[in-house]
Amino acid sequence: MASQQVTVNSLAFDGSVRRTWQCDLVERRDPLVVFVEHGELGIIQKGTISYEYYWLDRWYNIFRFHEPDGTFRNYYCNVNMPPTFVDGELNYIDLDIDIVVWPDMSYQVLDRE
């Protein structure tokens, strides 16, 4: 599959855009959509490799982060409403519960408000 640039929008519960970014579509096997991003990721070190896994029928997505040298860093799991993917744009409503899973399989629950 030729690389396709897409826009991902993380939305608040009221539908307003919290964060938006560009990435490349690397796989689509409904209901799974996989993106890769190599850009500036906010507080994440520039050059970090981010693989993003979204299922159009599930209430979560998973980011797999690698250091710039390719070493696995961690998984980051977002609890969200099932996303939509239409015309090169993926939108999901973030439900503000996140889980970080480290290489030793320990984890930390974040954003419980």
What label would you give each PLM region?
Residues R28-D30, P68-D69, W102-S106:
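Short acidic-glycine loop/turn motifs at beta-strand connectors
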Residues Q4, W21, R73-Y75, I97, ...:
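Structural beta-strand/beta-sheet cores of well-ordered domains, especially the beta-sheet scaffolds
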Residues L95-E113:
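A hydrophobic, small-residue-rich beta->alpha segment in the mid-to-C-terminal subdomain
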Residues L25-E27, Y54, V100-V101:
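Well-ordered beta-strand positions
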Residues G39-G42, M81-P82, E113:
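Short, solvent-exposed aromatic-acidic interface loops
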Residues M1-I49:
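Charge-rich, low-complexity N-terminal segments
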Residues N9-F13, H66, V100:
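A generic structural motif
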Residues Y53-I97:
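Structured beta-strand/loop patches that form or line metal/cofactor-binding pockets in enzymes
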